[in-house]
């Protein structure tokens, strides 16, 4: 009596290569979208800090009748803040660092907002996502 050999179970090399190729294609599409999503998620850190900084500057002006000497808000995790003040004007700039390099947002005493991002520049607004315009 002949014994039949047991069937070999498992994947062939071709099947594994096709699965790897499919995963690579999906990763190539998903990674840039994810990176864009993460960048957009970091932008509110800058805009919130600028808004809070503007309020602090206005409170200082109400107490002292000058913007000079007002404290600049502290740096965040992804943005560094810098202030320029005169007796009657101020500008607060949030400049991106690390993964947010290339992003810059400003606000002034008139609530004038500008932005410079890899996605485009906003002369009168803050650009928060790719394709936005003022």
Which stretches of residues belong to each language-model region?
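Bacterial Sec-dependent N-terminal signal peptides
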Residues: 2-4
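N-terminal single-pass transmembrane signal-anchor helix
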Residues: 6-34
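Residues at secondary-structure transition points
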Residues: 8, 40-44, 48, 85, ...
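Membrane-proximal N-terminal amphipathic helix
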Residues: 38-66
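Periplasmic/extracellular, small/polar-rich flexible segments of pilin-like filament-forming proteins
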Residues: 55-134
